[in-house]
Amino acid sequence: MSNEKYNIERNFTDMTQWLETPLGKNLLDIETSLLEQMINRRFGYHLLQLSCADVAVYEDSPIGHKFCLTPSTKVKNGSLVAQAEAIPLAAEAVDMVVLHHVLDYSSDPHQLLREADRVLIAGGYLLIIGFNPFSTWGVRHRFGRKAGKSPWKSSLLSSLRLSDWLKLLDFKVEQIHYGLYSLPVNSPGLIRYSSLLGKLAQRLNWPTGGIYVISAKKQALAMTPIREPWKAIPSKTKGLALGDNASIAPTQQHKKTLH
């Protein structure tokens, strides 16, 4: 196993364990609440989630076929095993893509976004959940990265920077919601107290929350009005997928440059 693959799987395992802590559970509760407002009225055939941990944050979606891409086979919610920067699906294969903190931990966030764009149909939705660098959580990340422990070893991208990248890829950013105004401390009492203080900020959607959720619609026109049946890319190298096996296959990159 290469060092890069080992680090990806180790980060995945560490984040899965951290999300079982009081602070991690509070984070997931708030993220689920914010996502519910964005996905419960979005319809389609297929939803793909890429997450930093073994969790499913798409339960409120009415889309029938929901599945996860993970870096490891030792998961509960994994349906497709591959690297996030090389999604083994055909172009325009899914109606919605959910990126759950994967950009925070990606070594190549530009390529990851290009892959999400490639597999998403025209008119489909991309939802991005990330840690906000302009928050108390962002400060904690800045001083906690040297310790090398999850979730503080991630590299944070601001919602403004991601919005610029999405525009270059012909996405229309429709909503940005902020949340998690509680202090980043693993104490149930302090979490409850600071959450109460943050209710006004949540109501006003202040851009100082610990997380953000971006909803963006793909604007590019489809090449053909006839939609082909959904399928993964076949290859001699097998991967794990729903139904038929799928595998990691090289994909063509968009030529647009993200800065």
What are these regions (language model features)?
Residues 1-40:
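Class I SAM-dependent methyltransferase Rossmann-like catalytic core
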Residues 33, 37-87:
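Class I SAM-dependent methyltransferase SAM/SAH-binding core
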Residues 85-97:
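A short acidic, Gly/Pro-enriched loop at the edge of an enzyme's catalytic core
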Residues 110-125:
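A short glycine-rich, Lys/Arg-flanked "PGG" loop and its adjoining helix->strand segment in the class I
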Residues 125-153:
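Conserved class I S-adenosyl-L-methionine
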Residues 143, 153-176:
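Short alpha-helix
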Residues 173-199, 207-208:
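Conserved catalytic loop of SAM-dependent methyltransferase domains
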Residues 196-259:
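C-terminal lobe and adjacent flexible extensions of AdoMet/dcAdoMet transferase-like proteins
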